[in-house]
Amino acid sequence: YSAVMLGYSSVDEFADTNSLLVDAEQLFPKGSIELANLKLLSAISIEDCILMAASLSCQSGSVLRSTFYKMLRGKTELLYPVESYIYEDGLGLSGWIENKRVLLGTRELMENHSIDGLPSEAKEKEYTNGNVAVYLSISGITAAMFVIQVSPNLSVTRWLQELELEGITTVIRTVDGFLSQRFLSDLFDIESDSVKLLSFRYHKDYESETEYVPRQASSMLC
């Protein structure tokens, strides 16, 4: 992404900018997020676990979407239709697929829904080995743990740090519970108060503000 300021009027218009809206997917270009391990935690097949998690991720716009796309080798026709979903702020996704309640997110999400079959925190630490645990539950049972390796992109890190220096807050739309302010500040080496996470109730407002329009004011071309 790039931008061009067209004249002094553009400088006047944007001089007081104090925040920037961005989708979390833009912070993690291809190769930033990889599947490090997959731990089955129930009798549910690995294929069903992958398809359920991939379906919910792809429908919601999760940063894990490209990771699952890679696992499916681009065969999106295999995905299940998602009947509905919501993002529980700071926790993860809750949706309905094939008349089954499917949760995808943090350990806290599972605990909040009293999901059975979670491994102990000691076991989780052993399985993840410093990476991120994303849990999948199907119909009230912990089905699998996806161990995710997240690496900061150098150019993204640089512009987030530059925005911080300019006093501009990056407001992030995400549906991934593990992307907390603390996680992002540690990952990109910025202060935690330089990023804010957009609550799910404002996601439709975000979409209306950032949707494509055929015409735009000439003060800035992006």
Model-predicted regions and their roles:
Residues 1-54:
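Conserved catalytic phosphorylation-site environment of P-type ATPases
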Residues 5, 97-99, 141-222:
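Conserved ATP-binding TGD loop and adjacent catalytic N/P-domain core of P-type ATPases
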Residues 25-26, 96-101, 136-141:
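A glycine-centered beta-loop-beta connector
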Residues 35, 108, 149-150:
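A generic structural motif
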Residues 39-90, 111-114, 120-124, 175, ...:
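ATP-binding catalytic core of ATPases
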